[in-house]
Regions:
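Beta-sandwich interaction modules
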Residues: 100, 108-115, 150-196
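Beta-strand signatures of extracellular beta-sandwich domains
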Residues: 52-54, 133-137
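A short beta-strand element within beta-rich, extracytoplasmic domains
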Residues: 114-128, 180
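Small/polar beta-strand repeat architecture
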Residues: 15-49, 54-100, 184-185
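Short Trp-Ser/Thr-centered turn/loop motifs at beta-strand boundaries
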Residues: 5, 10-13, 97-114, 139, ...
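Extended, low-complexity, turn-rich repeat/linker tracts enriched in Gly/Pro/Ser/Thr and Asp/Glu
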Residues: 61, 124-133, 183-188
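Short, intrinsically disordered N-terminal pre-domain segments
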Residues: 1-21, 189-196
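Conserved Ser/Thr-centered positions that define the repeating blades of beta-propeller domains
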Residues: 137-143
Length: 196
């Protein structure tokens, strides 16, 4: 029987920026929240779990964050630490979609496989911007947090806007692996497939 590939990403595109004067940040008991009172943050064509957003226009939270939970159409939690900061109702805050991480997939270390051989295939559209990158990340943690992930050498794909398919082999007894797309300003990742 032929081995089947695990789909890490299936057709994920760059999203337009979200700007609002009602966006605030809250840090409470280790839960870090970005929320709005009327600006829609999630839903069709908006933010989802795994999206990377760069925040600008704030006093204390101009940084990149990973969406970890969608609470409602007006609220998300993020993996990274935010500083509590209320909106003032007049200052525009922008959430710029700059990439995404895939769900985690079991690596060879999960199954205690001795060879650790993995193959990944990336497929993007020709409109995928030239400085965007896709790379694989691994972890040895059984229940990883955002800080447990590290880049796997030799797996980075950078588009030249003409190459739309690329693959990489990598070796390691990673318990979990995932893909990470960064610096995305245009285009679509059609698919990322993994064989372990």
């Amino acid at each position: 029987m032929a081995q089947t590939s695990t789909t890490l990403i299936s057709s994920k595109s760059h999203l337009t920026s979200i700007t609002g004067t009602d966006i605030s940040f809250t840090a409470t008991s280790g839960i870090f929240t970005i929320k709005a009172t009327s600006t829609t943050l999630t839903g069709s064509g908006k933010l989802a779990v795994g999206d990377l957003i760069t925040v600008t226009g704030t006093t204390s939270n101009n940084s990149t964050f990973t969406v970890s939970t969608v609470v409602s159409t007006l609220e998300v939690t993020v993996s990274e630490v935010v500083t509590s900061e209320n909106s003032d109702g007049s200052t525009s805050v922008t959430l710029d979609h700059v990439g995404f991480v895939s769900d985690k997939a079991k690596g060879d270390g999960y199954y205690s496989q001795p060879d650790g051989v993995h193959t990944v295939a990336y497929q993007v559209t020709t409109s995928f911007n030239a400085n965007a990158t896709i790379k694989m990340q691994g972890t040895l943690a059984t229940t990883p947090t955002e800080d447990d992930w590290f880049d796997i050498p030799g797996t980075t794909f950078t588009s030249d806007t003409s190459t739309v398919t690329s693959s990489a082999n990598f070796t390691g007894n990673y318990v979990w692996v995932r893909s990470k797309t960064q610096l995305l300003t245009a285009g679509t990742v059609n698919s990322i497939l993994l064989n372990s």
